[in-house]
Amino acid sequence: DLPSAPIRRLLFEAPENTQGIWEIAEFEIYGKGFTPAASYVSNVIDLGGNAALGELSWQAEVDAGAQVELGMRAGDDDDPNTYWRNTFRGDERTRLDTRGRVMTLRSYNRLEKAQQAGITPDTENWEGWSAPYDLRADSAPMQSNKPRQFVQLRADFLSTVEAGGRLGYVQFAVSQPPVATLVSAEITPTLAPSGEITQFTYLLLPQMEFGDLGFDTIEIDTPTAIEGVDAVRFSGEDVAFDVMRIDERGFEIAIPRVDQTRDGELIEVVFSSPVFKFGTLFSGRVYDSTQPLEVRQVITAGEVDELVESNTLSVGLSNLSAEVVGALKLVPAAFTPNGDGINDQVRIEYDLLNVAGSAEVTVVLYDLRGGRIGEVFRGPARSGQFQTAWDGRDQ
């Protein structure tokens, strides 16, 4: 039997066949379990032109005790790396070869060892690797801050002898051409008091080129259901709009169509919303409602109006404190659980403030003497507004 420990190489030795009485026709080795670690990196995938990146989907099987990490990155050229050459002038190094051309992998490999100064990620033209996707889901949005032409995928496998992981397939959706070459956006103000309704202005600047599809709908993510959309302005002038959706995930509005005739025109969306967590991200997307199957194009954070000192879609808290629970109230303040259908339940409403990630939340009731009545809720929650109901019965 082979040893149970993982092995990489195996030496097979047979005595010299001096009399020619035997020969080897086939040689097979069988082992148990899975390779402890393996990694797959795809070739750079050329989409043929800039495209809006949509959903990444997969089929995965991961045994208990094993781990599979799937990630992706996107860029603007066909090589995600930068190659450096020593100039031998002190510690100076350059990305150019001796003829002044930007080096490629091929030209880098032709250098003498002493000339090779290393390979680094190309952060100018490529985004970094995404965080690993949660494979318990079947799909998730591709992580890219704007339309890109090139995509690369990576999968890392960590296994034990008895547990392994498998990827059946990985696929992704794109729309080409995109609805816009680029849609930049920033939000103001960038600081707000925790849990209080604040009016925000979401500024967008579309960059439209020939062939872009155009868009007529804006989708903005919010930490809770907003109070409402107060105004939409094109170049400072109010325009008509329709609210298509408002819920706990955000809102969507229909606006006058944006195409090449509105290239570089400032769009403002004014809405009111509370913020519960430092660094709340108001991400957004634009799309063409007449083509619902196309990818919704992500909005890129950046400078839109030089008079607005933001350049971000993130909002912080102006009154950081150690309090985690805010705005606790009972609705109605008094209730009568007598079964007549009127005020038979009380709704316990509260805000969770500045919670990092997800936390375990427990709602426990006590009487006026401090005696425990019971637990009415237990479960994970993030920063935001929450409510739970109690029917007046001991739990």
What is the meaning of each model-derived region?
Residues 1-323, 336:
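Beta-strand-rich ligand- or partner-binding modules
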